[in-house]
């Protein structure tokens, strides 16, 4: 592994892990719908919010404040259910743990300069399930598990061209870590009953494979009038080279440990446009449209092993997983009401079309949540502001009827249900 790249990877994920042990879980595919409590309370409609969401639009960095410190956490509760009959039967709930996703932000305007510089650390999202007692197609009981963590370190700069127009750019340093179990205690010689003939099923345990990649984001913020703001942003794809972990395969004759690499995984490119409109001094409406290119980023993932710890016939195994995700369009709407004494109420709705094709649906990657209702609250005093938000995702059920066991080892009636879930956000800011 490249030393400099591995140091960056472990630094980013290490800082996040101190605050967020366990699994990240998300709602627009693998992404959180919002970047901070205000954004989340407004349903993720955030690209035209000045000074409050530089992670989504670098042109909004800092706003009117000279210095801004912000930080917070999201508490996530992802209830997922897996059912099948043909290769089961199973009716299993993923362990209902509560997970923590943090963010930290610093912005500093350079004296009277039009430049503002900042640094953001953000647990972007990920995915996680843990089924510890699943009946396999062989009749035994085994485990399904995924823990995918995604974090970004984001150096950011914005430039105020004039009173109406601001431009921004950021370097997106993405770090990913993944662990997965696919029936690790199970082995089958396949339909022909001949071990090593090519149709064997081998149980898999992938441990601590990770890596770092780089992307860029550009943003524009424009005040059309005293009431109307527009925002536009574009994020390039982050190619991630993932290695440094272990691949353990159950080959029937023995459990063999390999050095592991994973290729074919990326964080998607995105484009977003949005508006913020002050209906009155006490009432704001926001709306965004966001395009996420999961089709290019999450297609086929290959896990490759090397340097086995035992002398076995399979020296360099390759396991390919077809995911075939689709492009996703996300629509976000929000409203913000200013009450007396600087109390603010927020409401939002977020709809993201399901990017996961049913024929490649897997209980390991339940990324098919579509609709979310949100509620938020904000209060400011002196130089501080406190923001809270609640996200409620609506139930979504999907069934994989793909009869090909090489692409769907869970049977042609496997159903994954993401039950109604909740995310709580808490954030505190200090501006001067």
List the model feature ranges, each with a label:
Residues 71-100:
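Mid-chain, structured segments of secreted extracytoplasmic proteins
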Residues 2-11:
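Bacterial N-terminal signal peptides that target proteins for export
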Residues 25-40, 47, 87-90, 99-432:
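Outer-membrane beta-barrel porins/channels
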Residues 47-49, 54-67, 106-112:
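Outer-membrane beta-barrel pore proteins
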Residues 30-43, 62-80:
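Transmembrane beta-strand segments of Gram-negative outer membrane beta-barrel proteins
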Residues 13-14, 24:
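Cleavable N-terminal signal peptides
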